[in-house]
Amino acid sequence: MFLLPRFCLVCSIIGTFGFENPPTNVVSHFNDDWFLFGDSRSDCNHVVNTNPRNYSYMDLNPALCDSGKISSKAGNSIFRSFHFTDFYNYTGEGQQIIFYEGVNFTPYHAFKCTSAGNNDIWMQNKGLFYTQVYKKMAVYRSLTLVNVPYVYNGSAQPTAFCKSGSLILNNPAYIAREANVGDYYYKSEADFSLSGCDEYIVPLCIFNGKFLSNTKYYDDSQYYFNKDTGVIYGLNSTETITTGFDFNCHYLVLPSGNYLAISNELLLTVPTKAICLNKRKVFTPVQVVDSRWNNARQSDNMTAVACQLPYCYFRNSTSNYVGIHDVNHGDAGFTSILSGLLYDSPCFSQQGVFRYDNVSTVWPLFPFGNCPTAASIISSDLPICVYDPLPIILLGILLGVAVIVIVVLLLYFMVDNGIRQHYA
């Protein structure tokens, strides 16, 4: 208890001199082992190809363009490349992973498989997809997209009926009905294989509703069977609705192996692309920056829904996106968020990134890294610091020893002085 006045005095001195070390609203990294996935707002190659060269197009600081730590493509996103013919092979590796993409598949694009479809289902798909990606990249270093080879023994070819605007679905592939089959009540199969990666994220999708064709209604049914382990993954249509439904996707995490895609009704689907996950690492939360349009266009919050603690930290600006190149490119708030990539930081938390690991006036929530020893402020002037008890105990012991030494020395000199006076 005798340490408490000194303890509070130290905290008061820190507060007096203004060393508050607050969390900052940025994405950053502990060291040089990081990687960013993005779109045009961090696509240095897109900027280089514009004439004249204009870095105001980006939210990323141009000093990072030659870092080799960025995989970005103007007009694209990982979700868009995963499902559609508009493809870019996002590839990167790092201990600390940052995502700043997703805006290129939003309600603004209004995608739905058919004219009677539902874009809300695709927003749900987007959220489920990024949930798996963020969770897995907290424990894997490497992400890339790979093709999935498959063998279908029939003569029918994949159909491109699931399309809207410039977007054409090609993952999963939708195998058309064989010419000699009269309706959609038939069983169809295709072999596919996964090899070369530690794990894969693959789509398993169905039309969850009554699909009408030639006055008959069909219930979709799709399965993937692992021929090596005997495990089966499946979805069956459960809804009775006949309009307003669309392609519901689940995103399975599968091991390498030989698989059989099976359809018992409607059309056969088989994955053609997968997220390839490699090199397991010590759990390190990913960081996600909100990816949205200027308010003149409709955006969604699916990356925020997917980014949940403890595997993900979400960063956002409090204001509308207003770019300086155009309204959708070069926003000051998001440029500020990405500026944290210019330097190392020791601690990530729910509130933000801490620049220093000694003390702070804010207690880090869901901290990760070497975080400051601090707690909340109970008054505007006096932070109450909570330290590791070991240094406090050692300090107490040292102070106690110092007091004993001082007392002994005082007694010694008092006795010695008395003896001298006696002999004098």
Curated annotation (Swiss-Prot):
> Pfam families under this entry?
Hema_esterase, Hema_HEFG
Instruction: Report the catalytic activity.
Output: N-acetyl-9-O-acetylneuraminate + H2O = N-acetylneuraminate + acetate + H(+); N-acetyl-4-O-acetylneuraminate + H2O = N-acetylneuraminate + acetate + H(+)
Q: Which GO terms describe its biological process?
A: fusion of virus membrane with host plasma membrane
Its main subcellular localisation, reduced to a broad class, is virion
Q: Which residues lie on this side of the membrane: Virion surface?
A: 17-392
The question of whether Magnesium is a record keyword is answered with no
Task: Consult the record and explain the modifications the protein receives after translation.
Answer: N-glycosylated in the host RER.
Annotated region (Esterase domain 1) at 7-127
According to the record, the signal peptide region is 1-16
Mind telling me which InterPro entries this protein's record contains? Capsid_hemagglutn (IPR008980), HEMA (IPR042545), Hemagglutn-estrase_core (IPR007142), Hemagglutn-estrase_hemagglutn (IPR003860)
EC number(s) reported in the record: 3.1.1.53
Q: Give the function comment from the record.
A: Structural protein that makes short spikes at the surface of the virus. Contains receptor binding and receptor-destroying activities. Mediates de-O-acetylation of N-acetyl-4-O-acetylneuraminic acid, which is probably the receptor determinant recognized by the virus on the surface of erythrocytes and susceptible cells. This receptor-destroying activity is important for virus release as it probably helps preventing self-aggregation and ensures the efficient spread of the progeny virus from cell to cell.
Oligomeric and partner information: Homodimer; disulfide-linked. Forms a complex with the M protein in the pre-Golgi. Associates then with S-M complex to form a ternary complex S-M-HE.
The protein in question is named Hemagglutinin-esterase
The record lists the lineage as: Viruses, Riboviria, Orthornavirae, Pisuviricota, Pisoniviricetes
Gene of origin? HE
